[in-house]
């Protein structure tokens, strides 16, 4: 579960290393987000020469959470870290590579470009 002020690792090569959640998108007064949800973030730590800089306000989709998610068959999937991928307005990733596994739930959110770039889909 991701909420305001949560810090997440960035799982792409857009130049950001760590982001801080500003807002969870999708409904009035929505408090938490899970895998596949879009959030508004600010970049807290960035690599030099990257596409995004420190202080930029960006949109991101959550690809891994420590709390995990329950699937329809009754199984749970959890990860070791909270991670996101920075996206453009058309739901495509800003970077050209995705690092680490991503959850299968991104398919239902129409993030097929992220799923196809990921090295592993769990």
Swiss-Prot record:
GO biological process: translation
Record-level GO cellular component terms: cytosolic large ribosomal subunit
Residue ranges crossing the lipid bilayer per the database entry: none
InterPro entries recorded: Ribosomal_uL14, Ribosomal_uL14_bac-type, Ribosomal_uL14_CS, Ribosomal_uL14_sf
Gene3D superfamilies: Ribosomal protein L14
Molecular function GO terms recorded: large ribosomal subunit rRNA binding; structural constituent of ribosome
Top-level lineage group: Bacteria
SUPFAM superfamilies: Ribosomal protein L14
Keywords: Ribonucleoprotein, Ribosomal protein, RNA-binding, rRNA-binding
UniProt-listed Pfam families: Ribosomal_L14
Entry function: Binds to 23S rRNA. Forms part of two intersubunit bridges in the 70S ribosome.
NCBIfam families in alphabetical order: rplN_bact
Quaternary structure and interacting proteins, as annotated: Part of the 50S ribosomal subunit. Forms a cluster with proteins L3 and L19. In the 70S ribosome, L14 and L19 interact and together make contacts with the 16S rRNA in bridges B5 and B8.
Family label: Belongs to the universal ribosomal protein uL14 family.
Protein name in the entry: Large ribosomal subunit protein uL14
UniProt organism field: Staphylococcus aureus (strain NCTC 8325 / PS 47)
């Amino acid at each position: 579960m991701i909420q305001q002020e949560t810090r997440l690792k960035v799982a792409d090569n857009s130049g950001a290393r760590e982001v801080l959640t500003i807002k969870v998108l999708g409904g009035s007064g929505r408090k938490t987000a899970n895998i596949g949800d879009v959030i508004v973030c600010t970049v807290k730590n960035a690599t030099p020469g990257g596409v995004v800089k420190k202080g930029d306000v960006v949109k991101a989709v959550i690809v891994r959470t420590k709390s995990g998610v329950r699937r329809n068959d009754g199984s749970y999937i959890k990860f070791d870290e909270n991670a996101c991928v920075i996206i453009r307005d058309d739901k495509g990733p800003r970077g050209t590579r995705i690092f680490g596994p991503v959850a299968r739930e991104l398919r239902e959110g129409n993030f097929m470009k992220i799923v196809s770039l990921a090295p592993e889909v769990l």
